[in-house]
């Protein structure tokens, strides 16, 4: 399915709620169970983190989750095996969030072959500069897996246009300067930034980094096509407050166009 499965998540004015889970945090059975829960709860896409020892874009909550996964001996191969098993039960799109190092250490061809076997539909690589994306982009295109671009508040408009013109899936618009994590509010310029990104791409635009309340979700999906919620979802899963995740999903759905 690949790119098509991601496209379907945004069809007919649908707003996407994209929760992030760390692969192997709590064990691989927990990963599969969490994906099943998020699918049943109505999440649009699930973003699965590949744990890495030097996660430069991650805030403290996601760093801790990654460390727990690594400390428990979870491997990239193990995560792929868990995804292969749970893919038989769910149709929700899978997007991997991975740093470049684990891809190269695993072997990029082997990594992408495993993505195909596991039914992965897209990949986000936060430390892969646009200028160097040919390291993996041609292989991903051949496999029909979207390389999801990230743009930031400080990205010049010409760069945003260039990055998004050759991309697939959706555009991940980083809404804060700095790392991931819970924020209290967003500055007014974020609204104009998101509108600017939307006006210069044919792809859906999804806001991420720092989104942690239902009010944030409602605010963001009035401007763009969806939200990624990472640190807050990890906290809620850890504290068994799953009903709050369901409330986030409902807040997203209520903003869908008629």
From Swiss-Prot:
Record-stated family: Belongs to the TrpA family.
CDD domains named among the record's database cross-references: Tryptophan_synthase_alpha (cd04724)
This protein's name: Tryptophan synthase alpha chain
Catalytic activity line of the entry: (1S,2R)-1-C-(indol-3-yl)glycerol 3-phosphate + L-serine = D-glyceraldehyde 3-phosphate + L-tryptophan + H2O
Matches recorded under InterPro entries: Aldolase_TIM (IPR013785), RibuloseP-bd_barrel (IPR011060), Trp_synthase_alpha_AS (IPR018204), Trp_synthase_suA (IPR002028)
Pathway entry: Amino-acid biosynthesis; L-tryptophan biosynthesis; L-tryptophan from chorismate: step 5/5
Source organism (scientific name): Bacillus thuringiensis subsp. konkukian (strain 97-27)
Gene3D superfamilies tied to this protein: Aldolase class I (3.20.20.70)
